[in-house]
């Protein structure tokens, strides 16, 4: 788990400038945003690896794409980031990827390459890219997948 996305203030977005927002649990930014969007329900905690998946549960994966898509991005402009952003858009849209490696992801400014590699190994039955954004220089994607067991 990316420790820069961790807060000791359980269930609070205070560390990210929203002290008035509490969501009842979670310590990682991805967990907190997921809880904010999905509301109250029975959650399992964040974990380091995606698999094994539970076919009876909704699994929400929160991971950023390249963080070097513009000169003002967190990692400044990285020449290979735009092509990687497009490759990750296609992965989210189709569930398929070709030639995705840890080294290529890391060199393109992806801070959690292992998470993307785990996603690329899933047996995806249906994939759909709902939205993507890179206006702040970091690739962000929203998609839904149905995976085969």
Predicted region positions:
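Flexible, D/E/H-enriched segments
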Residues: 1-49, 74-149
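Catalytic metal-binding/acid-base residues of hydrolase active sites
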Residues: 2, 63-67
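Extended accessory regions or peripheral subdomains of proteins
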Residues: 66-75
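Short amphipathic alpha-helices and their capping/turn segments at secondary-structure boundaries
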Residues: 50-55
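Beta-strand elements within well-structured catalytic alpha/beta cores of enzymes
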Residues: 56-64
């Amino acid at each position: 788990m990316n420790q820069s996305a961790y807060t000791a203030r359980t269930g609070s977005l205070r560390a990210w400038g929203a002290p008035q927002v509490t969501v009842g649990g979670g310590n990682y930014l991805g967990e907190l945003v997921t809880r904010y969007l999905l509301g109250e329900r029975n959650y399992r905690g964040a974990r380091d690896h995606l698999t094994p998946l539970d076919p009876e549960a909704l699994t929400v994966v929160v991971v950023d794409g390249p963080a070097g898509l513009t000169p003002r991005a967190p990692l400044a402009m990285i020449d290979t980031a735009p092509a990687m952003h497009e490759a990750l858009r296609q992965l989210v849209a189709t569930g398929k990827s070709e030639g995705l490696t840890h080294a290529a992801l890391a060199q393109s400014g992806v801070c959690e390459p292992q998470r993307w590699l785990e996603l690329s190994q899933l047996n995806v039955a249906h994939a759909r890219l709902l939205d993507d954004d890179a206006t702040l220089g970091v690739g962000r994607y929203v998609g839904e997948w149905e995976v085969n067991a």
